[in-house]
From Swiss-Prot:
Subcellular location: Cytoplasm
InterPro entries: ATP-grasp, ATP_grasp_subdomain_1, D-Ala_lig_Van_CS, D_ala_D_ala, Dala_Dala_lig_C, Dala_Dala_lig_N, PreATP-grasp_dom_sf
Binding site for Mg(2+) 2: 310, 312
Organism (species): Leptospira interrogans serogroup Icterohaemorrhagiae serovar copenhageni (strain Fiocruz L1-130)
Biological process, per Gene Ontology: cell wall organization; peptidoglycan biosynthetic process; regulation of cell shape
Protein name (Swiss-Prot/TrEMBL): D-alanine--D-alanine ligase
Length: 351
Protein backbone atom coordinates (compact mmCIF):
# COMPACT_ATOMS: atom_id res chain seq x y z
CA UNK A 1 0.00 0.00 0.00
CA UNK A 2 1.13 3.54 -0.74
CA UNK A 3 1.65 6.70 1.29
CA UNK A 4 -0.68 9.21 -0.38
CA UNK A 5 -0.93 12.95 0.24
CA UNK A 6 -4.39 14.24 -0.70
CA UNK A 7 -4.48 17.92 -1.69
CA UNK A 8 -7.83 19.70 -1.40
CA UNK A 9 -9.40 23.06 -0.58
CA UNK A 10 -7.58 25.91 -2.30
CA UNK A 11 -8.24 29.62 -2.76
CA UNK A 12 -10.54 29.36 -5.79
CA UNK A 13 -14.30 29.89 -5.78
CA UNK A 14 -14.62 26.08 -5.84
CA UNK A 15 -13.07 25.69 -2.37
CA UNK A 16 -16.22 24.24 -0.79
CA UNK A 17 -16.65 21.63 -3.54
CA UNK A 18 -12.99 20.67 -3.26
CA UNK A 19 -13.47 19.95 0.45
CA UNK A 20 -16.26 17.49 -0.39
CA UNK A 21 -14.06 15.96 -3.10
CA UNK A 22 -11.11 15.69 -0.72
CA UNK A 23 -13.21 14.02 1.96
CA UNK A 24 -14.52 11.43 -0.49
CA UNK A 25 -11.02 10.72 -1.83
CA UNK A 26 -9.54 10.35 1.67
CA UNK A 27 -12.34 8.08 2.83
CA UNK A 28 -12.06 5.85 -0.25
CA UNK A 29 -8.25 5.60 -0.15
CA UNK A 30 -8.39 4.79 3.57
CA UNK A 31 -10.82 1.92 2.99
CA UNK A 32 -8.44 0.64 0.29
CA UNK A 33 -5.72 0.32 2.92
CA UNK A 34 -3.51 3.22 1.88
CA UNK A 35 -1.80 5.55 4.36
CA UNK A 36 -3.47 8.93 3.84
CA UNK A 37 -2.16 12.40 4.69
CA UNK A 38 -4.88 15.03 4.03
CA UNK A 39 -3.38 18.42 3.09
CA UNK A 40 -5.77 21.36 3.29
CA UNK A 41 -5.10 24.48 1.25
CA UNK A 42 -6.99 27.27 2.99
CA UNK A 43 -9.06 29.97 1.30
CA UNK A 44 -6.50 32.63 2.22
CA UNK A 45 -3.62 30.73 0.61
CA UNK A 46 -2.28 28.94 3.68
CA UNK A 47 -1.48 25.25 4.09
CA UNK A 48 -2.36 22.78 6.81
CA UNK A 49 0.13 19.91 6.47
CA UNK A 50 -0.20 17.13 9.07
CA UNK A 51 3.09 15.86 10.45
CA UNK A 52 2.04 12.23 10.14
CA UNK A 53 -0.17 9.87 8.18
CA UNK A 54 -3.42 9.48 10.09
CA UNK A 55 -7.10 9.90 9.36
CA UNK A 56 -8.90 12.36 11.62
CA UNK A 57 -10.95 14.34 9.15
CA UNK A 58 -14.04 16.23 10.40
CA UNK A 59 -16.39 14.69 7.84
CA UNK A 60 -19.40 15.82 9.87
CA UNK A 61 -18.79 19.51 8.99
CA UNK A 62 -17.56 19.02 5.41
CA UNK A 63 -20.52 21.06 4.11
CA UNK A 64 -19.32 24.13 6.02
CA UNK A 65 -15.86 25.26 4.75
CA UNK A 66 -15.15 27.64 7.65
CA UNK A 67 -16.10 25.13 10.33
CA UNK A 68 -14.22 22.41 8.48
CA UNK A 69 -11.00 24.46 8.38
CA UNK A 70 -11.31 25.37 12.07
CA UNK A 71 -11.89 21.78 13.13
CA UNK A 72 -9.22 20.45 10.75
CA UNK A 73 -6.62 22.78 12.27
CA UNK A 74 -7.65 21.73 15.78
CA UNK A 75 -7.02 18.10 14.92
CA UNK A 76 -3.83 18.48 12.90
CA UNK A 77 -2.35 21.70 14.25
CA UNK A 78 -1.43 24.87 12.38
CA UNK A 79 1.51 24.06 10.13
CA UNK A 80 4.02 26.10 8.22
CA UNK A 81 4.19 26.06 4.44
CA UNK A 82 7.80 24.87 4.48
CA UNK A 83 6.63 21.49 5.80
CA UNK A 84 5.49 20.71 2.27
CA UNK A 85 9.12 20.69 1.11
CA UNK A 86 9.84 17.64 3.23
CA UNK A 87 6.65 15.83 2.29
CA UNK A 88 7.19 12.09 2.47
CA UNK A 89 4.69 10.71 -0.05
CA UNK A 90 4.71 8.11 -2.79
CA UNK A 91 2.19 10.17 -4.75
CA UNK A 92 -0.07 13.21 -4.40
CA UNK A 93 -3.76 12.68 -5.11
CA UNK A 94 -5.22 15.97 -6.34
CA UNK A 95 -8.71 16.86 -5.15
CA UNK A 96 -8.44 20.55 -6.04
CA UNK A 97 -10.78 22.39 -8.42
CA UNK A 98 -10.25 25.62 -10.31
CA UNK A 99 -7.57 28.27 -9.81
CA UNK A 100 -4.06 27.15 -8.95
CA UNK A 101 -5.24 23.61 -8.34
CA UNK A 102 -6.37 23.04 -11.90
CA UNK A 103 -4.33 25.47 -14.02
CA UNK A 104 -0.99 23.65 -13.81
CA UNK A 105 0.40 25.60 -10.85
CA UNK A 106 0.23 22.85 -8.21
CA UNK A 107 1.27 20.29 -10.83
CA UNK A 108 4.44 22.26 -11.58
CA UNK A 109 5.15 22.69 -7.87
CA UNK A 110 4.90 18.94 -7.30
CA UNK A 111 7.18 18.26 -10.25
CA UNK A 112 9.80 20.56 -8.73
CA UNK A 113 9.49 18.57 -5.50
CA UNK A 114 9.79 15.33 -7.46
CA UNK A 115 6.45 14.01 -6.21
CA UNK A 116 4.26 12.08 -8.69
CA UNK A 117 0.61 13.15 -8.82
CA UNK A 118 -2.74 12.08 -10.23
CA UNK A 119 -4.39 13.68 -13.24
CA UNK A 120 -3.05 15.77 -16.09
CA UNK A 121 0.35 17.42 -16.27
CA UNK A 122 1.27 21.10 -16.26
CA UNK A 123 0.65 21.90 -19.93
CA UNK A 124 -2.63 20.01 -20.37
CA UNK A 125 -3.97 21.49 -17.12
CA UNK A 126 -3.08 25.03 -18.16
CA UNK A 127 -4.56 24.68 -21.65
CA UNK A 128 -7.80 23.06 -20.49
CA UNK A 129 -8.26 25.80 -17.89
CA UNK A 130 -7.94 28.45 -20.60
CA UNK A 131 -11.28 28.08 -22.38
CA UNK A 132 -10.22 30.10 -25.42
CA UNK A 133 -7.01 28.14 -26.01
CA UNK A 134 -8.85 24.84 -25.49
CA UNK A 135 -11.55 25.82 -27.99
CA UNK A 136 -8.91 26.77 -30.55
CA UNK A 137 -7.33 23.34 -30.18
CA UNK A 138 -10.71 21.63 -30.49
CA UNK A 139 -11.39 23.53 -33.72
CA UNK A 140 -7.96 22.69 -35.11
CA UNK A 141 -8.60 19.00 -34.42
CA UNK A 142 -11.90 19.13 -36.32
CA UNK A 143 -14.31 19.22 -33.40
CA UNK A 144 -17.35 21.47 -33.14
CA UNK A 145 -17.69 24.33 -30.65
CA UNK A 146 -20.08 27.26 -30.46
CA UNK A 147 -18.80 30.53 -32.05
CA UNK A 148 -16.88 32.61 -29.49
CA UNK A 149 -14.80 35.72 -28.83
CA UNK A 150 -12.20 36.42 -26.16
CA UNK A 151 -12.11 39.90 -24.63
CA UNK A 152 -9.12 41.28 -22.75
CA UNK A 153 -9.80 43.70 -19.88
CA UNK A 154 -7.47 46.36 -21.30
CA UNK A 155 -9.09 46.04 -24.72
CA UNK A 156 -12.50 46.48 -23.11
CA UNK A 157 -11.47 49.55 -21.12
CA UNK A 158 -9.88 51.20 -24.16
CA UNK A 159 -12.65 50.41 -26.67
CA UNK A 160 -15.80 49.56 -24.74
CA UNK A 161 -18.32 50.38 -27.48
CA UNK A 162 -16.33 48.54 -30.15
CA UNK A 163 -16.09 45.46 -27.93
CA UNK A 164 -19.81 45.47 -27.19
CA UNK A 165 -20.61 45.83 -30.89
CA UNK A 166 -18.32 42.89 -31.74
CA UNK A 167 -19.92 40.68 -29.10
CA UNK A 168 -23.39 41.56 -30.38
CA UNK A 169 -22.53 39.77 -33.64
CA UNK A 170 -22.79 36.50 -31.68
CA UNK A 171 -26.47 37.27 -31.21
CA UNK A 172 -28.58 36.92 -28.08
CA UNK A 173 -28.75 35.02 -25.88
CA UNK A 174 -25.04 34.36 -25.41
CA UNK A 175 -22.93 33.07 -22.54
CA UNK A 176 -20.36 35.24 -20.79
CA UNK A 177 -17.73 33.59 -18.61
CA UNK A 178 -14.18 34.08 -17.29
CA UNK A 179 -11.61 32.51 -19.61
CA UNK A 180 -10.18 30.66 -16.61
CA UNK A 181 -12.72 29.23 -14.22
CA UNK A 182 -14.70 26.14 -13.38
CA UNK A 183 -17.99 24.78 -12.03
CA UNK A 184 -19.79 27.48 -14.06
CA UNK A 185 -18.89 30.12 -11.47
CA UNK A 186 -19.50 33.68 -12.80
CA UNK A 187 -21.18 32.34 -15.95
CA UNK A 188 -24.03 34.51 -17.20
CA UNK A 189 -26.69 34.07 -19.83
CA UNK A 190 -26.87 37.43 -21.61
CA UNK A 191 -30.04 38.55 -23.40
CA UNK A 192 -29.39 42.21 -24.30
CA UNK A 193 -26.75 44.93 -24.76
CA UNK A 194 -27.19 46.56 -21.36
CA UNK A 195 -26.87 43.26 -19.54
CA UNK A 196 -23.75 42.54 -21.60
CA UNK A 197 -22.13 45.76 -20.35
CA UNK A 198 -23.17 45.10 -16.77
CA UNK A 199 -21.84 41.54 -16.58
CA UNK A 200 -18.61 42.34 -18.43
CA UNK A 201 -17.84 45.01 -15.85
CA UNK A 202 -18.70 42.57 -13.06
CA UNK A 203 -16.45 39.77 -14.34
CA UNK A 204 -13.59 42.18 -15.01
CA UNK A 205 -13.59 43.13 -11.33
CA UNK A 206 -11.85 39.82 -10.60
CA UNK A 207 -10.74 38.42 -13.98
CA UNK A 208 -8.58 39.79 -16.78
CA UNK A 209 -10.04 37.83 -19.70
CA UNK A 210 -13.61 36.98 -20.66
CA UNK A 211 -15.01 34.64 -23.27
CA UNK A 212 -18.43 35.17 -24.83
CA UNK A 213 -19.99 32.29 -26.70
CA UNK A 214 -23.11 31.81 -28.78
CA UNK A 215 -26.01 30.09 -27.05
CA UNK A 216 -26.83 26.64 -28.42
CA UNK A 217 -30.07 24.78 -27.79
CA UNK A 218 -29.89 21.02 -27.42
CA UNK A 219 -29.31 18.12 -25.06
CA UNK A 220 -26.57 18.69 -22.47
CA UNK A 221 -24.41 15.67 -21.70
CA UNK A 222 -21.12 15.03 -19.94
CA UNK A 223 -18.74 12.14 -20.58
CA UNK A 224 -15.83 10.95 -18.47
CA UNK A 225 -12.64 9.37 -19.80
CA UNK A 226 -10.43 7.06 -17.74
CA UNK A 227 -6.91 5.88 -18.52
CA UNK A 228 -5.82 2.43 -17.48
CA UNK A 229 -2.63 0.42 -17.71
CA UNK A 230 -3.37 -3.11 -18.84
CA UNK A 231 -1.10 -5.80 -20.34
CA UNK A 232 1.79 -3.38 -20.64
CA UNK A 233 -0.23 -0.77 -22.53
CA UNK A 234 -1.96 2.52 -21.70
CA UNK A 235 -5.62 2.47 -22.69
CA UNK A 236 -8.33 5.13 -22.70
CA UNK A 237 -11.97 4.27 -22.09
CA UNK A 238 -15.01 6.52 -22.26
CA UNK A 239 -17.67 6.09 -19.60
CA UNK A 240 -21.43 6.18 -20.24
CA UNK A 241 -22.42 9.83 -20.74
CA UNK A 242 -24.69 11.61 -18.27
CA UNK A 243 -27.61 13.73 -19.43
CA UNK A 244 -27.93 17.03 -17.59
CA UNK A 245 -31.39 18.51 -17.11
CA UNK A 246 -30.78 21.88 -15.37
CA UNK A 247 -33.25 23.10 -12.80
CA UNK A 248 -32.58 26.66 -13.99
CA UNK A 249 -31.86 28.21 -17.36
CA UNK A 250 -28.56 26.38 -17.70
CA UNK A 251 -26.16 24.11 -15.79
CA UNK A 252 -24.64 26.77 -13.52
CA UNK A 253 -22.95 26.41 -10.10
CA UNK A 254 -26.28 26.19 -8.27
CA UNK A 255 -27.56 23.52 -10.65
CA UNK A 256 -24.37 21.51 -10.32
CA UNK A 257 -24.00 21.44 -6.57
CA UNK A 258 -27.24 22.38 -4.82
CA UNK A 259 -29.62 19.54 -3.98
CA UNK A 260 -32.38 19.50 -6.57
CA UNK A 261 -30.51 22.02 -8.71
CA UNK A 262 -30.44 19.67 -11.69
CA UNK A 263 -31.54 16.23 -12.75
CA UNK A 264 -28.70 13.95 -13.85
CA UNK A 265 -29.50 10.83 -15.84
CA UNK A 266 -26.84 8.16 -16.35
CA UNK A 267 -26.69 6.77 -18.97
CA UNK A 268 -28.03 9.70 -20.99
CA UNK A 269 -31.33 9.31 -22.85
CA UNK A 270 -29.74 9.57 -26.28
CA UNK A 271 -29.49 7.16 -29.19
CA UNK A 272 -26.82 4.47 -29.30
CA UNK A 273 -25.22 6.29 -32.21
CA UNK A 274 -25.16 9.60 -30.31
CA UNK A 275 -23.70 7.91 -27.22
CA UNK A 276 -20.93 6.34 -29.30
CA UNK A 277 -20.19 9.68 -30.96
CA UNK A 278 -20.03 11.53 -27.62
CA UNK A 279 -17.67 8.90 -26.22
CA UNK A 280 -15.42 9.10 -29.28
CA UNK A 281 -15.28 12.88 -29.02
CA UNK A 282 -14.59 12.78 -25.27
CA UNK A 283 -11.55 10.59 -25.91
CA UNK A 284 -10.53 12.87 -28.81
CA UNK A 285 -10.79 15.95 -26.56
CA UNK A 286 -8.76 14.18 -23.84
CA UNK A 287 -6.10 13.33 -26.41
CA UNK A 288 -6.13 16.76 -28.12
CA UNK A 289 -5.37 18.57 -24.87
CA UNK A 290 -2.81 15.98 -23.76
CA UNK A 291 -4.77 14.98 -20.65
CA UNK A 292 -3.65 12.16 -18.40
CA UNK A 293 -5.36 9.86 -15.93
CA UNK A 294 -8.90 11.10 -16.37
CA UNK A 295 -11.00 13.97 -17.66
CA UNK A 296 -14.63 14.87 -18.20
CA UNK A 297 -15.89 16.69 -21.28
CA UNK A 298 -19.21 18.53 -21.41
CA UNK A 299 -21.20 18.66 -24.66
CA UNK A 300 -24.42 19.98 -26.06
CA UNK A 301 -26.00 17.85 -28.78
CA UNK A 302 -27.53 20.03 -31.49
CA UNK A 303 -29.55 18.20 -34.17
CA UNK A 304 -27.68 14.99 -33.41
CA UNK A 305 -24.21 16.57 -33.52
CA UNK A 306 -22.25 17.01 -30.25
CA UNK A 307 -20.56 20.38 -29.69
CA UNK A 308 -17.87 20.62 -27.00
CA UNK A 309 -18.51 23.03 -24.15
CA UNK A 310 -15.37 22.36 -22.10
CA UNK A 311 -13.03 19.69 -20.76
CA UNK A 312 -12.33 19.36 -17.03
CA UNK A 313 -8.96 17.88 -16.05
CA UNK A 314 -9.84 17.56 -12.34
CA UNK A 315 -13.57 16.83 -12.43
CA UNK A 316 -15.61 16.77 -9.24
CA UNK A 317 -15.13 13.67 -7.14
CA UNK A 318 -17.78 13.97 -4.44
CA UNK A 319 -19.95 10.95 -3.70
CA UNK A 320 -22.62 12.25 -6.10
CA UNK A 321 -20.35 13.68 -8.82
CA UNK A 322 -20.65 12.65 -12.46
CA UNK A 323 -17.52 10.48 -12.68
CA UNK A 324 -18.64 8.22 -9.79
CA UNK A 325 -22.12 8.02 -11.35
CA UNK A 326 -20.68 7.06 -14.73
CA UNK A 327 -18.18 4.57 -13.31
CA UNK A 328 -21.02 2.85 -11.44
CA UNK A 329 -23.06 2.64 -14.66
CA UNK A 330 -20.05 1.04 -16.36
CA UNK A 331 -19.65 -1.50 -13.55
CA UNK A 332 -16.39 0.05 -12.33
CA UNK A 333 -15.89 0.66 -8.61
CA UNK A 334 -14.33 3.89 -7.36
CA UNK A 335 -11.62 1.79 -5.71
CA UNK A 336 -10.70 0.55 -9.18
CA UNK A 337 -10.83 4.10 -10.60
CA UNK A 338 -8.53 5.39 -7.86
CA UNK A 339 -6.13 2.46 -8.28
CA UNK A 340 -5.86 3.25 -11.99
CA UNK A 341 -5.29 6.96 -11.32
CA UNK A 342 -2.51 6.15 -8.87
CA UNK A 343 -0.88 3.66 -11.23
CA UNK A 344 -1.03 6.07 -14.19
CA UNK A 345 0.40 8.88 -12.06
CA UNK A 346 3.28 6.72 -10.85
CA UNK A 347 4.08 5.36 -14.30
CA UNK A 348 3.95 8.82 -15.90
CA UNK A 349 6.59 10.03 -13.44
CA UNK A 350 9.00 7.44 -14.82
CA UNK A 351 8.95 8.88 -18.36
Amino acid sequence: MAKIAVFFGGSSTEHSISILTGCFICKTLHTMGHSVKPILLTKDGGWVVPSEYRMSIPFEVSNSPDLFQEEFQKRYGVSRTNQIFSLDADIAFLGLHGGQGEDGTIQGFLEILGIPYTGSGVLASAIAMDKTRANQIFLQSGQKVAPFFEIDKLEYLNSTDAVITKLETLGFPQFLKPVEGGSSVSVYKITNREQLKEKLALIFESDSKVMSQSFLTGIEVSCGVLERYRDGKFKKIALPATEIVPGGEFFDFESKYKQGGSHEITPARISEQEMKRVQELAIAAHRSLGCSGYSRTDFIIVNGEPHILETNTLPGMTETSLIPQQAKAAGISMEEVFSDLIEIGLKRSLY
